[in-house]
Every structure is written in C-alpha cells, then in structure tokens.
C-alpha cells in the first residue's frame, strides 16, 4: 500500500512561517502536497514563483490585494481568487487535510472559522484569530482539530503528553525578553522602529518582531494558552529565557517539570503541526549536548513591560476582551511604525482602550459581535493615538 500524502493549504505563503512551511513540505514531498496558497499580495512575484513551482492552477491561488491579483492572474494565465475574503474562499473551495493559517493579524479570523467548518485540521500560527475569536472559535472546533504552530504552544502540547490534564500543576511560558530586555521604561522612549525590528534570537515578520519587543506577543500567547488548553490564566507563569532554547515547560503535581528544548527555529513546530501527532524526521538539527551550554531564566520586568500582566487580566475577563487587546495593539503598533507615537505608548494605548472596554465588550454569540468589538476598539485606539500624536 502506497504512502498517502496529506493535502495542505498554506495561508500566508509569502511570510516567514509560510516560506518555512513550504521548505518543510519540499523536503518531505512523500508526506505532503500543497493544494493551494494564499497571501496578502505585497510580494506578487513570490506568489507567482510559488504557484508555478507547486504546479497550482490559478483558482488555487488567493490574494487579498486587487492590484497584485491582476498581476498574478496574468502571469498564471487564469483568474485567481482576490479580495479581502480571498483566503476564506480558498478554504471553502479547496479540499485539504490540514490548513496552515499563517496570516498576520485578526484578518485571519474568517479563514480560521472556515477551516473549522470544513472539518480540516487547523495548524494555527495566526494566534490573533484565536485571541480575537476566543471561546467563540474554540466552540466551533472538534476535539484535537486545532494544532498550535507557535513554538511555545507546540512545546506545551508535546510536554502535556507526559501526563494527564489532572496532573498538570503549572504551565511555564518562556520569552526571549526581546531586544530591549533590561531596559527601563524611560530608556525605551528613544526606541526607533528600526531597533524594534531587530530580534535577538528569532527571524520573524515586522509585526511579530515588534510585538515581541513590547512583549504583547507573549501576552497574546498567554491568552492563546488559556484557550487552547482550557487553563486558568493564574496557572500560567511567564519567564524570560534569553537563549530561546526551552520553549515551554509543564510542572506536574508530583513536582516533575518537563521541558521541550530545541534550537530557535520554526521548522520543527511547523513540521509537527503538519503531521501531528507524528514527528517529521530531521525537521531541524538537534541540540548538541556534548557542547557547553548556559541557559538563564529571569522574571519579567512588569514595570518596563506591562503587556503580560495586562494580558493576564484580559484572559480572566474572557468574552471579547482579548479581541480589544489585540485590535488596540494592531492600531498602536502601526502608529509607532509610522512615527506617530513612541514605543512605550503602544501598550499605554492598549491599556487605556481596555479601561473603557466594559462599555462595548462582552460575550460573543456571533462573529459579528467580535467584528463590532474590534471596530470599536480600533476607533477608540485611533482617537487616542491622534491625541498623543499632536503632543509629540
């Protein structure tokens, strides 16, 4: 009997996760077959190259940007799927075993919901869609349907196989600390977008790198962990581990702590998510334990980086509060990149929007509730940004 290949859809094919996923698939063509790709459209030439190398028909390519779509359609000799719902439409019209959602931001929510509706496994790198959708998203998922791609949550899933749910005492989420580890809040007022784009251990896209610098990314991951593993936020510790070798740890009720350790590369969690629960041989080089290593751990400086504690509060509130946290951050982060606000003001904006969230945030019974909450959060964030920008 021949080996059955898994049919994979890649959403966000031109980004860091998407390109690495395509590398993993190319190295394991006996295991995986790409049946469609989606991207925003900022790199049309790369989309064309990917589609041609994969032998995809035009109708198995989706791009959000209309101008880029026209260029790509011409090159591929047929009309591709285009528009803001392009990725969602691709999911709905393409049969796949696994959909890798590596889109950026809460725009990935529609594709996440479409994947869950289709019955395909969701390899989720787009944490924002889970954070924004919260319990509304998890309620749509079958048991085991969502497979985390984030290295931290992939590590948690691996460690959890060492015991039962009742035996888990605490989850330990590790953070590199970002490029400004050890800096005071006062010093960070001088941070430039260029400095924030330089991560010490990981190669990521611009927004993820900035979110790592503010530790908003770690806040999103804390919220994500409560949803994926149905865990109370107070049972999750966050520790700074500058080497980014240990990706997460689980402490069990008997006092044992199981850690997942590997070099800082996304190829291992990507490969594991694509073929879960099986491991893909040689997904990445292993650590050499015959060489000397020094691993350090230190507490998060909550005064300099309040994003994690803010996320813990948000996770406890549940409902659409996480959607407010994410949407306000997306607007504030973009404002910083455009030079409209200072680096510490990113989290300040998120905090202030959350303080007024009781007026518009609540429990989501429909996707429109999430979208309405996001829209209000963005409007409030931008109003605050406009006030701050006039004082710079």
Swiss-Prot record:
EC category name: oxidoreductase
Q: Which residues bind 1-deoxy-D-xylulose 5-phosphate?
A: 127, 151-152, 176, 199, 212, 217-218, 221
Under the heading Gene3D superfamilies, the entry gives: 1.10.1740.10, NAD(P)-binding Rossmann-like Domain
Q: Please indicate if the UniProt record lists NADP as a keyword.
A: yes
Q: Which residues bind NADPH?
A: 14-17, 40, 43, 126, 128, 205
> Could you tell me the gene encoding this protein?
dxr
What InterPro entries does UniProt report for this protein, alphabetically?
DXP_reductoisomerase, DXP_reductoisomerase_C, DXP_reductoisomerase_N, DXPR_C, DXPR_C_sf, NAD(P)-bd_dom_sf
Q: Which domain of life is it from?
A: Bacteria
The membrane-spanning stretches of this chain are: none
User: What organism does this protein naturally occur in?
Assistant: Corynebacterium glutamicum (strain ATCC 13032 / DSM 20300 / JCM 1318 / BCRC 11384 / CCUG 27702 / LMG 3730 / NBRC 12168 / NCIMB 10025 / NRRL B-2784 / 534)
This protein's name: 1-deoxy-D-xylulose 5-phosphate reductoisomerase
**Function description:** Catalyzes the NADPH-dependent rearrangement and reduction of 1-deoxy-D-xylulose-5-phosphate (DXP) to 2-C-methyl-D-erythritol 4-phosphate (MEP).
